[in-house]
Amino acid sequence: MPSLKDLRNRIASVKATQKITKAMQMVAAAKLRRAQEAAEAARPYSQRMGAVLANIAQNVSGEDAPALMVGTGKDDVHLLVVCTAKRGLCGGFNSQIARLARDHARKLLAEGKTVKIITVGKKGADILRREFSALLHDHVDLREVKQLAFVHADQIGHKIIKLFEEGAFDVCTLFYSEFKSVISQVSTAQQLIPASADNEAEMETAGDAIYEYEPDPAAILSTLIPRNISVQIFRALLENVAGEMGAKMSAMDNATRNAGDMINKLSITYNRQRQAQITKELIEIISGAEAL
């Protein structure tokens, strides 16, 4: 049984930890609002761009279609771009994204495909390195980035397009977590290359609208598809930040509550042990007085 001094030290230690988790919860809550607003603001733009691409794609076929839209005609080599948080302490947020990417990689490898992985965020790299260290092609470290901007997504997009033009892969899939609410983030896989317009809402919007394009649709697609890749990556990064802050706020709230429960239990144990010690000392004093 621990001594009273040990119990006091443990209570003080848990209280100090509770202050830290409470502060982290408040910081995450403050960041969550801004991150959520940024993610929600990016959705209409990315969705509308997808709708425009779907509409233009209906007017382009054959040799006029850009390679980024039709692909290489093969699906032998797959590039997985896995976006996770740059830090931990956010529950199962990172592991859920990594699990989705890992399952997809295992499936492709079982089918005899070649898999290459680009990780965005330190935690995803740490998780996937345990099983797929030989498949890790590149890593994008955003730990020094204080304010996420489109230029960061654009750099990743240019890197992916350059690899595609060099013939490094046939299909590119983006993995991230779509923000739903503070307690709900959905791990998502989205095909970037070949550019896919399989979203029903985008197809319906594209079918309802009538556009006239100048210059020709193929020339527009050649410019718009690379832009769309960067836009989709930027949206994924913004969704990830919002999801990370939501998961971190929830995790730190649970940690703060658990610390409070532990403090209560330790305090009860401390008071009982202290009471027992006082009672024992009183009995010894009374026994000594009676002996005299």
Curated annotation (Swiss-Prot):
It holds the Pfam family ATP-synt. The keyword Cell inner membrane applies. This is ATP synthase gamma chain. Keywords: ATP synthesis, Cell inner membrane, Cell membrane, CF(1), Hydrogen ion transport, Ion transport, Membrane, Transport. It is found in: Cell inner membrane. The keyword Chaperone does not apply. It comes from the Bacteria.
